[in-house]
């Protein structure tokens, strides 16, 4: 049985800290607790406006954790330079809109193919694994393969927002796209809006190798603590994976 990895996004620890402008809660400490509880990687989204995690946080997290740092960034030159300075294990390139509350859609690989190819080439030359956050659309996935991305992260936002009846169609689309990406030689990840309830159907897609989950785990941690919140998610992932073997 292949292990499904869990990346824990700690952005919203910083969001809570920034409400009062102090030092606590510290995203570095929570990243360490997530790792102790079984997180396979730590994800941070370093935004252009530093609305939650900032560059200092990311550097401290990288120095403090034993697992992998996955850095989500926009494709602006300034942000790519920050990634080069930080040198994370992996970078996930995402679209960014200053007015959005959270990432609203996947990156348009087709439209930005030439530029993205240069960015990917530069990051990979420094030993950084590169992922593209894409909507479950075959043409976007094909373009991701053509510009030598290592991975795609399928946007599960639409699936996560729908009720049970509607999301059957979306989950089938995600399955098809995951299989397609796998055939193209891309490693497949998934994330956005996943929680302790809707993650179960995603776990059953064998081509998906890693999930990135943040808000629901951080929210749960306010009730049960960070380590228990991560363990509960890992238990759900493991039990569902076993069930479908």
Curated annotation (Swiss-Prot):
Pfam families, from UniProt? PdxJ
List of residues binding 3-amino-2-oxopropyl phosphate: 9, 20, 193, 214-215
Q: What is its main location?
A: cytoplasm
Which Gene Ontology CC terms are recorded? cytosol
In the Enzyme Commission scheme, what number(s) does this protein have?
A: 2.6.99.2
- Compartments reported by the entry: Cytoplasm
- Per the record, the domain of life is Bacteria
* Residues that, per the record, bind 1-deoxy-D-xylulose 5-phosphate: 11-12, 47, 52, 102
Q: Does the keyword Transferase apply?
A: yes
Keyword Cytoplasm appears in the UniProt entry: yes
- Print the keywords alphabetically: Cytoplasm, Pyridoxine biosynthesis, Transferase
Q: Which InterPro entries match?
A: Aldolase_TIM, PyrdxlP_synth_PdxJ, Pyridoxine-5'_phos_synth
What processes in GO biological process is this protein linked to? pyridoxine biosynthetic process
Function, as annotated, reads: Catalyzes the complicated ring closure reaction between the two acyclic compounds 1-deoxy-D-xylulose-5-phosphate (DXP) and 3-amino-2-oxopropyl phosphate (1-amino-acetone-3-phosphate or AAP) to form pyridoxine 5'-phosphate (PNP) and inorganic phosphate.
Its subunit composition reads: Homooctamer; tetramer of dimers.
Similarity remark: Belongs to the PNP synthase family.
- Name-wise, this protein is Pyridoxine 5'-phosphate synthase
């Amino acid at each position: 049985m292949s292990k499904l990895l869990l990346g824990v996004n700690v952005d919203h620890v910083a969001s809570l800290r920034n409400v009062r402008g102090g030092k606590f809660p510290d995203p570095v400490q929570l990243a360490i607790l997530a790792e102790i509880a079984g997180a396979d990687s730590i994800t941070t989204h370093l935004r252009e406006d530093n609305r939650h995690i900032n560059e200092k946080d990311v550097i401290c997290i990288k120095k403090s954790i034993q697992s992998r740092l996955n850095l989500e960034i926009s494709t602006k030159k300034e942000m790519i330079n920050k990634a080069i300075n930080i040198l994370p294990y992996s970078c996930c390139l995402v679209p960014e809109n200053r007015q959005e509350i959270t990432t609203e859609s996947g990156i348009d690989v087709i439209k930005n193919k030439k530029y993205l190819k240069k960015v990917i080439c530069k990051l990979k030359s420094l030993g950084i694994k590169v992922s593209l956050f894409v909507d479950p659309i075959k043409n976007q996935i094909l373009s991701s393969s053509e510009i030598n991305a290592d991975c795609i992260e399928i946007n599960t936002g639409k699936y996560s927002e729908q009720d049970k009846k509607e999301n059957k169609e979306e989950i089938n689309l995600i399955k098809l796209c995951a299989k397609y990406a796998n055939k193209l030689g891309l490693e497949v990840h998934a994330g956005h809006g996943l929680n302790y309830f809707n993650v179960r159907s995603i776990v059953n897609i064998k081509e998906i190798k890693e999930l990135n989950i943040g808000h629901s785990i951080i929210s749960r941690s306010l009730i049960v603590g960070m380590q228990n919140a991560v363990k509960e998610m890992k238990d759900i992932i493991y039990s569902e994976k076993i069930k479908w073997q």
